[in-house]
């Protein structure tokens, strides 16, 4: 990364942080202030079956369709920050329509495993200045952990090679389309299986895949946290058994 790119990277991070700090200050004073950020789990269906994923990968009763999501987006305050996720958000029918409605009045992030990305879809995203972050889930070099977790996927190497190409294409096209403030992010779930390779994963994401940012995330402490299905209210008082890392010292 050049010095100029590094300075730009720092500047947008500072602006993002300052904007959130300003909103937090306002939230303490203003009554009935709507949230600034929203995470929409468009579907809990997914084209993968990773054993460490907390989502229920079956269609839930009462799940919203694209028309209902679009109607919901119309009720949110202008200039919100919307994250579209899943499951695999690109798997929902009419995803492009949901995205288009989102970026009309809001900033938009997308979290995806990347397998359904295409050049046409990336161009479609990057034409919108309100599209801010594309996040790809990567748990080790070549995402071999996900290959092992999805043994029925016989063409994993070919499909992951496609994702790598799409990420590099994304970085090239955002410059060509003058949308360089859009961020290519990578997210890694910290597991015992990848605990010896965390620095190598970071190098893979930043150096090989040219990601602008890379973050690590731990497994949830409670199944209720960030859940995509309903619990009874009193369940919040029940003791839950968090995952215990065997290689915590290494991590």
Spans of model-derived segments:
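Conserved alpha-helical substructure of the radical SAM core
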Residues: 2-132
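Radical SAM enzyme [4Fe-4S]-AdoMet core and its adjacent flexible, acidic
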Residues: 1, 62-64, 132-251
């Amino acid at each position: 990364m050049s010095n100029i790119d590094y300075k730009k990277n720092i500047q947008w991070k500072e602006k993002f942080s300052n904007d959130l700090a300003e909103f937090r200050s306002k939230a303490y004073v203003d009554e009935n202030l709507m949230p600034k950020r929203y995470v929409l789990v468009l579907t809990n269906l997914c084209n993968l079956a990773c054993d460490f994923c907390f989502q229920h990968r079956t269609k839930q009763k009462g799940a919203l369709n694209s028309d209902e999501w679009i109607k919901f987006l119309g009720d949110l305050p202008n200039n919100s920050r919307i994250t579209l996720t899943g499951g695999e958000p690109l798997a929902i029918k009419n995803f492009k329509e949901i995205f288009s409605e989102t970026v009309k009045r809001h900033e938009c992030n997308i979290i995806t495993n990347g397998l359904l990305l295409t050049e046409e879809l990336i161009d479609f995203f990057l034409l919108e200045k309100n599209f801010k972050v594309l996040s790809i889930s990567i748990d080790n070099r070549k995402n071999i952990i996900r290959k092992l977790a999805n043994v029925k996927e016989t063409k994993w190497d070919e499909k992951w090679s496609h994702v790598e190409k799409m990420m590099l294409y994304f970085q090239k096209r955002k410059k060509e389309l003058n949308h360089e403030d859009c961020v290519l992010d990578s997210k890694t779930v910290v597991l015992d299986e990848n605990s010896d390779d965390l620095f190598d994963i970071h190098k893979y994401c930043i150096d090989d895949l040219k990601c602008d940012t890379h973050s690590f995330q731990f497994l949830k402490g409670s199944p209720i946290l960030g859940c995509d299905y309903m619990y009874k209210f009193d369940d919040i008082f029940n003791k839950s058994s968090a995952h215990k890392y065997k290689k915590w010292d290494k991590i």
